[in-house]
Amino acid sequence: MEDPFELVRRAADALRPDKIAAAVEQQIYTVRVLLGTGFAAPVRPDKIARAVWLLQRWSNTPAGAYSINALTNPERDAVIDELGSLTFRELHLRTNALAHELSNAGIGPDQNVAVMCRNHRYFVEATVALSKLGANTLYLNTAFAGPQIAEVVKREAASAVIYDSEFEGLVAAAKAGRACYTAWESDSTSAQPTLKQLIETGDRGDLDPPLAPGRVVILTSGTTGTPKGAARSQPKNLDPAVALLSRIPLKARERALIAAPLFHSWGFAHFSLGLVLSSTYVLQRHFDPEATLAAVERYRPTVMAVVPVMLQRIMQLPEKVRRKYDTSSLRVVAVSGSALPGELATSFMDEFGDILYNLYGSTEAAWASIATPQDLRAAPGTAGVPPRGTVVRLFDDQNQEVQPGGTGRIFVANEMLFDGYTSGGNKANIEGMLSTGDVGHIDANGRLFVEGRDDEMIVSGGENVFPAEVEDLLARHAGVAEAAVIGIPDKEFGQRLKAFVVRRPGSKLTDEQLKTYVKSNLARYKVPREVEFMDELPRNSTGKVVKRKLAPPAHKGNGAKPAARSSKRASQKTR
């Protein structure tokens, strides 16, 4: 039982005049932001009353959002995919049926269910149905290998697995002793129940809410080893949505093409934000740059959510192909998931207009900062500034804040920090702020620049080098499509830089030309000693370069921790 004196202390603290004033200010700001999105559409008074009742019953969960939208926007499209469209009413009834059937099979509150699906209606329906049951949903990365899947499913004690039929071979080892269901059917030979069958036969009546909402578990990218499960509770209020809306001008009831994988923290964040705004999701199972432009022309979305490598693939299309499609409906292209090179941001906006918004964060920290088109024009490569209610500070290795302009480890505080790893442990935490695992600096205008991973810093001849600076410079070369830089062992200097470069089509760029180019723009110790040309860089499903696949077998780490830095304060808080 909780200490009654602690309860009294918290109650007294909440009644402090400054706390009350801050809470009132936040509520006023929330209303203003939501009104700005067009959130308040004309609705009959009786429907408003019932919507409030549903919100109280289901809280800010996918189950609650679709229950409310089935009432207030019943005939609006909720999802558009390769099978057609589903209205909010249809999706609500279908997920009722699915939830009833899963419940009949023994799936219930606080049970863990693994979902391995691409972007399509069954991902959404599985998510909503499990939310209606109060189950915890574990999203599996579709790029994982079989052993990784089996290890994660066992570690997370999943009682059931829902997956697309194309992953049958990958999940084989994870299926033993667990209920299994097929989501998207690539053929009609499934020997186990399919979500389509459960939806067709299930009871479509409404369910009672669970005693507590289920959690969402997003897996880390696993670029440095076995992915960890990052658990996150459902938001208690609309503050997280308002934080993002304070920097990204999304509107209610608009179409959003979510190209970023929904199982990834960025794709799922956009999905969650769309729940608040009653968005229509346009989903494609596979990303293809030209097919994506064709989908924009066909479905006329006003928003597109992508990862940087998707923008890169679009910009690598021949100019005549890019301009073949009418993309004028787009007014927001939101990008996240990995570093956005400044040159890519500039070239994309030159082609498609100043509609690009770059969100920087991590699976554990959710978001830290957002760069608007104005930020990206003024300072290409910036990660932007913290949105409302978010704090970003930089600390050295002695946990002291660095002086203004200095480089330090990035820590963030916001409304949606994760609850911790499901296997135990947490990220580094200072004064309630969570490490993103990156290092960076803040310029005189308060803009954050991410210089690289904390554990990727290369120490060569006593000099500290962050690969991102060299990679960004290489990417700006006319003959370079993409590049990655790592540190490899060197007897004389401790480490030396090695660049892995993908040439642009038709380029005959040599390693010496690249070295000369870097030398003319950066300090000598930042010039790669070796350059290896490749057809493509190894990437995971969200576009991050998997650098451990580039490192020599005997050198699976590529850096030391940053040296100690000054303790002078350099922080930023945006309200």
Question: What does each model-found stretch correspond to?
Answer:
Residues 238-255, 263-303, 317:
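Conserved AMP-binding/adenylation subdomain of ANL enzymes
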Residues 58-59, 75-120, 124-128, 145-150:
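Conserved AMP-binding/adenylate-forming core of the ANL superfamily
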